[in-house]
Amino acid sequence: MSLLIDFIDETEEVKEEYMSLIREVLEKAAQMENIEDGAEVSVTFVDNERIREINRDYRDKDQPTDVISFAMEEMGEGEMEIVGAEMPRMLGDLIISIPRAKEQAEEYGHSFDRELGFLALHGFLHLLGYDHMTEEDEKEMFGRQKEILEAFGLGR
């Protein structure tokens, strides 16, 4: 199983070990979700100010958040699918606030590793079409999240 992950660290404080952890968590999720080899995702690490800006500009929520996902496969009205056999499947972009991840790890009483793995997985599942807007969807997404985290060894 090979997921292509492009990391961008705008904070310049994310250690290689954290990127490796995220890579492994997302590889596990891709395997469990039967995502084909060569699919791509980008993961960008930002500060609270930057994620607040993105949240405001794209989601009309003027506040920092922990993770934002931009799925590439969501087709809007009037959009056409581009078919290319040689093109890798681009799943989308994940944007993670490092300060928010640290705050939440402390708030929830678990490690920064666990919080970072959780946020990356949560965002990744959104890229795959999971959501938590309804009670039923939330149950499905959170159940899958728990399953993957436990399979990886990051359960609570």
Swiss-Prot record:
Single strand-specific metallo-endoribonuclease involved in late-stage 70S ribosome quality control and in maturation of the 3' terminus of the 16S rRNA. This is Endoribonuclease YbeY. Binds 1 zinc ion. HAMAP family: Endoribonucl_YbeY. Belongs to the endoribonuclease YbeY family. GO terms for cellular component: cytoplasm. Its EC number is 3.1.-.-. One of its GO terms (molecular function) is zinc ion binding. It is found in: Cytoplasm. The keyword Cytoplasm applies. Zn(2+) binds at H122, H126, H132. Its main location: cytoplasm. Keywords: Cytoplasm, Endonuclease, Hydrolase, Metal-binding, Nuclease, Ribosome biogenesis, rRNA processing, Zinc. Its cofactor is Zn(2+). GO terms for biological process: rRNA processing. It comes from Bacillus cereus (strain ATCC 14579 / DSM 31 / CCUG 7414 / JCM 2152 / NBRC 15305 / NCIMB 9373 / NCTC 2599 / NRRL B-3711). The keyword Transmembrane helix does not apply. PANTHER family: ENDORIBONUCLEASE YBEY, CHLOROPLASTIC (PTHR46986:SF1).
